[in-house]
């Protein structure tokens, strides 16, 4: 029997999960009762917390959670001890044993998380559409939070439509609640609260750029009328979405230059202006929902801590180090990029800890699952995630969230999802052992080969991720001009135009990746040869791996092209290098046409077009004649028109908030 004391909905769900899964792996149907009269598994829970214990006793086995959610984790821990595995969402990520007789473990244990908060950020409608499987996986992986990252107006290329959440929340909120997961909502919505349509009659509400007021970015947070508008529309947002425990209403997503320079804002850094707006929203939230919080985002031009203002008690710090290096842990002292971000995190934590910190503060927003940052193919990062979790824990971070986004749905979920969930709970685990556990669940007939394939891919990607400060300085917002051939956008991995010797050294390091990829392909051949019923699932996972390998090859060829141009190579040599880079890009396009579903393909190819602009930029600068430049731009305009023939993409690019 399963004996459950109490009527918490989360505890009841835990009991049902235990009953159902035990039966699936070979146990008899066990009734759930309030008081057992014979051998039983007893389920108990306290007032709150994620820790749990498992203890054999004279009547069977006791599972006790610090709170109802801790009890649910105790159930999943017991099921894992019996051989159950959930390494990815959905049926392909589940592996359940089949026992003739289920024997309960005789050893006891006690466990609790190193980080109080461990969150999955659902950051695109692709993933919101399959959120049921992600929510179930998150609970089984001992994550504590689901954050639905949304956008109101503008293209939703890296977030869910707020209207999509409204369409889905009736189905998803009960699933999140029955598992005891916290729910967070929002994104770059701050400008939505001061609508641009007000500019015509009230230009003073909007930022002063040094010469005039403009409605292009953010607003003037110091103007009393702006603050009044924030209060009214902030209250409306909080009231419209009462299901959230944390609200994220962030400034515009840009590298810098989006805040106000009027006399009222004189002396306020970008960080202070952002915190001023957030504090106003926190005051409103305190009146409506004293139990909820609103986040302050330290990101890009607000990474450095505010100098003038202090946070409201209901403001939670969330630090987002997107431009960091993912070749090393965030606290690696020898890495000149990450050392800066570790210092900025520390100064933000110091500011927030001087006040009475909000319950989830300080927290970090990480990018281990970001298909936009990593160009639609996330590299495996076991050692980096492990090092990060240790550093974040030791720095006093209470919660780490990982952004799940991209320009297409995955064929199979990235390995980093499994690694992040496990390491956020217990950072001291050996990353190599975790990879082995994953491989044993995914490819039980060839686990060593699958582990080698991922180790090879990680080694191949390392030099692509190990940027220098000179390379990191090359980023450029999109769009930067009307002529994207002359000034194409540059993101974190677009460092090919760095000055010598950085570009030369990067090319030399990148070329070594080809040998690692060859080793990985050999390992994958062994995995596929051993596959049986899991063949289609493993083939999908390999397709994702191959995309990562092909993407890396393109980065090598692009780097080679730019280095040769910098060496002033002859035109024939440059044309050959351009042809090689174009062929590598064409491989990515062919992969997309075969594997990206039609509903997402145009958006994916639109972002792939940025790679084409990088090649065109070099050709325009070094190879084509003046009269050919117009023809080059005409071809790219024709490509854009072909993509825009897809009405779904046109709608996405033109639609505004519903």
Q: Language-model segments: what does each one mean?
A:
Residues 147, 184, 248-250, 318, ...:
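Conserved beta-strand positions in the central sheet of alpha/beta enzyme cores
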Residues 30-50:
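Short, well-ordered secondary-structure micro-motifs within conserved domains or adaptor modules
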Residues 46, 66-68, 252, 322:
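Solvent-exposed coil/turn segments that connect beta secondary-structure elements
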Residues 40-44, 120-123, 146-147, 293-300, ...:
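Short, hydrophobic beta-strand segments that form beta-sheet elements in well-ordered domains
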Residues 1-9:
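Right-handed parallel beta-helix/beta-solenoid
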Residues 12, 171, 179-180, 228, ...:
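Substrate-binding groove of N-acetylhexosamine-processing glycoside hydrolases
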Residues 8-17, 21-25, 54-243, 254-268, ...:
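Feature activates predominantly on carbohydrate-active enzymes
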Residues 250-254, 298-299:
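Short, well-ordered beta-to-alpha junction loops that form the rim of enzyme active sites
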């Amino acid at each position: 029997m399963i004996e459950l004391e109490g009527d918490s909905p989360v505890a009841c769900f835990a009991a049902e999960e235990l009953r159902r899964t035990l039966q699936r792996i070979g146990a008899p149907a066990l009734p759930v009762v309030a008081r057992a009269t014979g051998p039983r598994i007893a389920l108990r829970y306290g007032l709150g917390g994620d820790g749990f214990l498992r203890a054999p006793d004279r009547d069977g086995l006791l599972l006790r959670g610090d709170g109802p959610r801790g009890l649910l984790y105790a159930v999943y821990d017991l099921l894992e001890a019996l051989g159950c595995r959930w390494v990815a969402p959905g049926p392909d990520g589940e592996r359940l044993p089949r026992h003739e007789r289920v024997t309960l473990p005789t050893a006891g244990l006690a466990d609790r998380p190193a980080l109080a908060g461990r969150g999955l950020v659902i950051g695109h409608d692709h993933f919101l559409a399959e959120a049921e499987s992600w929510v179930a996986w998150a609970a089984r992986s001992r994550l504590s939070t689901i954050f639905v990252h949304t956008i109101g107006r503008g293209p939703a290329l890296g977030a869910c439509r707020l209207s999509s959440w409204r369409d889905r929340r009736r189905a998803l909120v009960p699933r999140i609640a029955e598992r005891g997961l916290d729910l967070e909502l929002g994104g770059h919505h701050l400008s939505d609260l001061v609508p641009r349509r007000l500019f015509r009659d009230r230009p003073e509400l909007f930022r002063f750029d040094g010469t005039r007021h403009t409605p292009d970015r953010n607003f003037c947070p110091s103007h009393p009328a702006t603050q009044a508008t924030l209060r009214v529309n902030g209250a409306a947002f909080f009231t419209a979405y009462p299901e959230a425990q944390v609200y994220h209403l962030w400034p515009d997503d840009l590298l810098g230059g989006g805040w106000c320079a009027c006399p009222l804002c004189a002396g306020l850094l970008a960080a202070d202006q952002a915190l001023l707006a957030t504090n106003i929203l926190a005051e409103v939230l305190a009146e409506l929902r004293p139990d909820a919080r609103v986040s302050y985002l330290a990101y890009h031009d607000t990474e450095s801590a505010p100098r003038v203002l202090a946070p409201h008690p209901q403001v939670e710090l969330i630090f987002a180090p997107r431009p960091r290096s993912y070749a090393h842990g965030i606290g690696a002292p020898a890495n000149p990029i990450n050392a800066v971000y570790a210092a900025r995190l520390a100064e933000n934590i110091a500011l927030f800890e001087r006040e009475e910190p909000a319950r989830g503060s300080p927290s970090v927003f990480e990018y281990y699952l970001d298909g936009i940052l990593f160009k639609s193919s996330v590299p495996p990062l076991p050692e980096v995630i492990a090092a990060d979790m240790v550093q974040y824990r030791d720095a006093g971070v209470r919660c780490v969230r990982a952004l799940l986004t991209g320009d297409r749905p995955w064929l199979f979920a990235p390995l980093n999802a499994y690694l992040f969930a496990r390491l956020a709970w217990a950072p001291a685990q050996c990353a190599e052992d975790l990879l082995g556990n994953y491989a044993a669940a995914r490819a039980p007939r060839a686990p060593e080969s699958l582990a080698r394939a991922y180790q090879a891919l990680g080694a191949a990607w390392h030099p692509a991720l190990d940027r220098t400060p000179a390379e990191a300085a090359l980023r450029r917002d999109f769009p930067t001009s009307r002529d994207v051939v002359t000034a194409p956008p540059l993101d974190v991995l677009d460092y090919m135009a760095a000055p010598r010797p950085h570009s030369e050294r990067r090319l030399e390091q990148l070329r070594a990746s080809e040998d690692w990829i060859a080793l990985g392909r050999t390992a994958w051949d062994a995995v596929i040869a051993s596959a049986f019923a899991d063949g289609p699932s493993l083939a999908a996972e390999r397709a994702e791996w191959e995309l990562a390998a092909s993407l890396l090859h393109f980065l090598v060829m692009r780097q080679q092209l730019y280095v040769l141009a910098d060496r002033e190579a002859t035109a024939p040599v440059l044309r050959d290098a351009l042809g090689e880079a174009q062929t590598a890009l064409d491989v990515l396009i062919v992969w997309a046409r075969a594997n990206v579903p039609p509903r997402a393909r145009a958006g994916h190819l639109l972002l792939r077009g940025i790679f084409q602009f990088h090649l065109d930029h070099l050709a325009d600068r070094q190879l084509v004649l003046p009269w050919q430049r117009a023809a080059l731009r005409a071809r790219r305009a024709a490509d854009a028109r072909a993509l825009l023939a897809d009405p779904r993409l046109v709608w996405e690019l033109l639609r505004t908030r519903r």
